[in-house]
A protein has these predicted regions:
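Solvent-exposed loop/turn segments at secondary-structure junctions
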Residues: 27-28, 38-42, 57, 87-89, ...
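Short glycine/serine- and small hydrophobic-enriched flexible loop segments
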Residues: 5, 68-75, 124, 168-175
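Periplasmic/cell-envelope proteins involved in peptidoglycan metabolism and beta-lactam response
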Residues: 1-61, 73, 77, 129-137, ...
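Active-site-proximal helix/loop microenvironment
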Residues: 140-207
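Conserved catalytic neighborhood of penicillin-recognizing serine enzymes
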Residues: 76-131, 175, 192-213
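Structural recognition of the beta-strand scaffold that forms the well-ordered cores
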Residues: 20-23, 32-34, 81-83, 109, ...
Length: 213
């Protein structure tokens, strides 16, 4: 909790009042730390609310999953070139964080630099319906609308997910790489204590992901 409080003191001047952390041992599936909020957050900002299971915009956190999905489907390799120029997708005109464009960018650098525009082009290639189905197979439950509801903004935080589900998806993929022969993997608390109602969403998520080492 000390780390969370330290970041809270850094970010509150930017009107960021809630921070949380969830740490999982990807080899065992055990939750090592669950800090639902900063301890010095005032009641007016929901200090007693555990924000880990709360659905919120995930920003760019789905980009690595899209990248993996694209590699799996043979749509690109790390050195493939992706477009990075101003574009309008049916009224949606994404911009990069620095509001600049490079023309073209290698796919691995798109991921490293978390570029928005090439990521939207990539989602267009993969297809929002196909990517959305993959996310649901990974254990995400908050994406309840059809692909047309989210559109290409899905890759830029245009929907909501929880820290619990995001951490579970990443941990499941990491476990798949570390122990590909395992057939059972479940996130649980140390001492065998069950998690919140969301804990079951992480059960064997890597087994249903379809990603392979």
């Amino acid at each position: 909790s000390g780390i969370i409080d330290r970041y809270h003191s850094l970010y509150r001047d930017n009107q960021i009042y809630n921070e949380a952390a969830l740490v999982i041992d990807v080899k065992t599936g055990k939750v090592l730390a669950h800090v639902g909020n900063a301890s010095d957050t005032s009641d007016s900002h929901g200090s007693k609310v555990d924000v880990i299971p709360a659905p919120r915009s995930y920003g760019s956190l789905l980009k690595p999953i899209l990248y993996l999905c694209s590699l799996e489907q043979g749509i690109l390799c790390p050195t493939s070139i992706l477009p990075d120029y101003p574009a309008n997708f049916g009224g949606f005109s994404p911009k990069n964080y620095n509001v600049e464009f490079d023309g073209v960018v290698p796919a691995d650098q798109v991921l490293v630099r978390s570029l928005n525009v090439p990521s939207v082009f990539l989602l267009q290639r993969v297809g929002t319906p196909r990517f959305l189905e993959r996310l649901r197979r990974l254990g995400f439950t908050t994406f309840t609308q059809p692909a047309t509801h989210y559109g290409l903004s899905l890759i830029l935080g245009g929907a909501e997910s929880s820290l619990w589900e995001l951490t579970g998806a990443y941990a499941g993929l990491a476990h798949r790489l570390l122990a590909p022969s395992d057939t059972v993997w479940k996130v649980s608390y140390l001492g065998g204590k069950g998690g919140t109602g969301q804990s079951r969403l992480l059960d064997a998520s890597y087994n249903t992901s379809g990603f392979h080492p």
